[in-house]
Curated annotation (Swiss-Prot):
Tissues with expression: Expressed in embryo and roots.
Membrane topology qualifier: Multi-pass membrane protein
Source species: Oryza sativa subsp. japonica (Rice)
Any single GO BP term: intracellular calcium ion homeostasis
UniProt keyword annotation of Heme present: no
One GO cellular component term: plant-type vacuole membrane
Keywords: Antiport, Calcium, Calcium transport, Ion transport, Membrane, Transmembrane, Transmembrane helix, Transport, Vacuole
Designated name of the protein: Vacuolar cation/proton exchanger 1b
Single GO molecular function: calcium:proton antiporter activity
Length: 453
């Protein structure tokens, strides 16, 4: 069956399946903070010209292209995807490939969120929630797996650490600061219950990172000479399994027993119709169409992520920046730009629960799911990746979680809290800017640091 015909028949079934799942307008549908954040970057597209196309199959195909490619404010960045592929095959400079690939990942990440939400219309709330949880940080997962395949453990660790720090300090800090300025005379309350759950899980994560680090120092100092040199690696693998168990319990807690804690308040009507996300309650793609597009977007994301991983050293040498700085600072900022922008937009509208759900939810997912999955996948590949992220990285993570927890304990925000978080991120960024690692691979477990003078 031709793809265009499949898409056309799939779209005719969309409304029937939506009725079956009680998801037509007028009936409530649970939407996570990630859904709402990504939706803030979507826009309506004029499809009136499509009605003049005589062929029904072609009209359906063009309608799908319109719904997937033109209903996002980031559609102008899609040419970067093709340019990155062309730059690779035409043997342009690797730095150009790196930059174009990073830019191309921005709209792809937003479209992956859109497509998983479309599929969730037909799968019900539980499976839809699992889909959103799985694809919420798919870019980080793909980059981590591809870097593991090339043995670049330092890139894996630094990129995941950078995503956590970026969500906790930069995204949340920017959102709180701009929300405080935009709503200077208004109260900015938020529900602390969700924040407490996420910070507790983040503290568990930093404990699992700290123990292998302390064990390595204990072994090298001779305090526990009876302990084998691989003890930290074995401990990391055990901790990773326990972290995944904790994450599964967190999903059950979030999607079943205490889902009311994670449901953002309904977005009220605003003057800007593009931000009325609560009205977006009807699928625009059929199930088959959404699955096809999801597979295509995932393949493109994997392709560009591979370009990023293979060219990061060239960018590091060209820009005279350490690989750790690019991985911790630049990759997370660009890779999650769409989601971060959505969090800031809702903060400006004083929808702080959505902003917290995006920033804390992403940090929790990366620390409790993506990181342990990376360790276990490396285990199956025979790669000795552990949870020892080195003293500087682990200390930065612990302090970031601590500052965030203290900032959110009152249940009300103002711009000074946001400014403090942003400045904390700036201090950490400067710290990683002034250091260089002598061993870029990081596969031997020994890391020497040089300070840029």
């Amino acid at each position: 069956m031709p793809v265009s015909r499949m898409m056309m028949e799939s779209n005719t079934m969309a409304k029937e399946m939506a009725v079956r799942h009680h998801l037509l307008p007028g009936s409530p549908r649970r939407r996570t903070a990630h859904n709402l954040s990504s939706s803030s970057l979507r826009k309506s597209s004029d499809a009136s010209l499509l009605h003049k196309v005589p062929c029904a199959a072609l009209r359906s195909l063009l309608a799908n292209l319109n719904d997937v490619l033109l209903t996002t404010r980031l559609f102008l960045l899609f040419p970067a995807v093709l340019l990155a592929i062309a730059a690779t095959y035409l043997h342009f400079g690797q730095v150009w490939v790196f930059v174009l690939s990073l830019i191309g990942l921005v709209p792809l990440a937003e479209r992956l969120s859109f497509l998983t939400e479309q599929i969730a219309f037909y799968t019900g709330p539980t499976v839809g929630g699992l889909l959103n949880a799985t694809f919420g940080n798919v870019t980080e997962v793909i980059i981590a797996l591809l870097a593991l395949r090339e043995g670049k453990i330092e890139v894996v660790k630094c990129s995941l650490l950078g995503s956590i720090l970026s969500n906790l300090l930069l995204v949340l800090g920017t959102s709180l600061f701009l929300a405080g300025i935009a709503n200077l005379r208004a109260h900015q309350p938020y529900d602390t219950k969700q924040a407490h759950v996420n910070t507790a899980l983040l503290m568990l994560a930093v404990l699992c990172h700290s123990l292998p680090l302390m064990l390595r120092y204990a072994v090298t100092s001779g305090d526990h000479a009876i302990v084998s040199g691989d003890a930290a690696l074995h401990l990391s693998r055990a901790c990773s399994i326990l972290m995944l168990i904790a994450y599964l319990a967190y999903l059950f807690f979030q999607l079943n027993t205490h889902r009311q804690l994670f449901e953002p308040q309904q977005v009220e009507d605003d003057d800007d119709d593009d931000l009325v996300i609560a009205q977006d309650d009807e699928p625009v793609l059929g199930f088959s169409s959404a699955m096809i597009w999801l597979a295509l977007m995932t393949l493109l994301t994997a392709l560009l992520s591979g370009y990023v991983v293979s060219t990061i050293e060239a960018a590091s040498e060209s820009w005279e920046l350490s690989v750790s700085f690019i991985s911790i600072i630049l990759l997370p900022i660009v890779g999650n730009a769409a989601e971060h922008a959505g969090a800031v937009i809702f903060a400006l509208k004083n929808k702080m629960d959505i902003t917290l759900g995006v920033s804390l939810g992403s940090a929790t997912q990366i620390s409790m799911f993506v990181v342990p999955v990376s360790v276990i996948v490396a285990w199956t590949m025979g790669i000795p990746m552990d949870l020892d992220f080195n003293l500087l990285e682990t200390g930065s993570l612990f302090l970031a979680i601590l500052v965030t927890a203290f900032t959110l304990q009152e249940g009300e925000s103002h711009y000074l809290k946001g400014l403090i978080l942003v400045l904390c991120y700036a201090v950490i960024s400067v710290c990683f800017f002034v250091i260089r690692r002598r061993s870029a691979g990081g596969t031997d477990g020994v890391h020497h640091l040089d300070v840029i003078v």
